[in-house]
Amino acid sequence: MEKSEATTIEIGETSRESKGKTPLLAEVEQTARTAGSYRRGVAIFDLILRVSAATSALAATITMGTTEQTLPFFTQFFQFQASYDDLPAFTFFVIALSIVTGYLVLSVPFSVVCIAQPLAAVPRLLLIVCDTLTVTLATAAASSSAAIVYLAHNGNADANWLAICQQFGDFCQRVSGGGGGVVRGGGSAHIHGGALRSRPEETLTDGVDVIHYWDRRWCEI
């Protein structure tokens, strides 16, 4: 007796499967589209703040780096002059803010990539890490400069530090303006760093998380 050939029977999708697949796929696409739109808006906001922070940092660097005042009177042996490079804290300020300005300018293309690819996680993570380091450097420079500016205005009798701002008024005004510029720039950097880390409550972290989420939901059905 010859063996009968195996017969393959194709079974179509059940009505339950056909009804459940399309809404889930549509919901995945809608969630991913919502997340992409939100993150594109955040990336545009980040780009604006990044350019603003770079402008403030550049202005603060130029202001501090060109600060110099010479009093109109002098003696046979002394000339009364004040410059930013007379104080190491101000020199550190200029170097640190130059680094911050260069970083902010170089980070603009990465911010543009975040606008073009809003669900890309690597550029956003790189910007967050570098922004944190940049804010730390700018804060250190501003703090050290603020301490010297305070001593220049008020002096310190215990350290025999005389208040020089009564004589070098223009010098103190310029270094104070430079410190104010880095505070504004650091504030902008902190804001756009927080914007990159934020997300809406109704969306997931990125497109991969969206797919994994709906894969789990699909397995539970």
UniProtKB/Swiss-Prot annotation:
Stretches in topological domain Extracellular: 63-89, 153-221
Pfam entry (one): CASP_dom
Keyword annotations of the record: Cell membrane, Cell wall biogenesis/degradation, Membrane, Transmembrane, Transmembrane helix
InterPro entries: CASP/CASPL (IPR006459), CASP_dom (IPR006702), CASPL (IPR044173)
Entry's Gene Ontology BP terms: cell wall organization
Residue intervals on the Cytoplasmic side: 1-41, 111-131
Region feature Disordered, mapped onto this chain: 1-21
Bilayer-crossing regions: 42-62, 90-110, 132-152
Domain of life: Eukaryota
Localization of this protein: Cell membrane
Bilayer topology term: Multi-pass membrane protein
PANTHER family found in the cross-reference section: CASP-LIKE PROTEIN (PTHR36488:SF11), CASP-LIKE PROTEIN 1U1 (PTHR36488)
Subunit structure: Homodimer and heterodimers.
Protein name: Casparian strip membrane protein 2
Lineage, uppermost ranks: Eukaryota, Viridiplantae, Streptophyta, Embryophyta, Tracheophyta
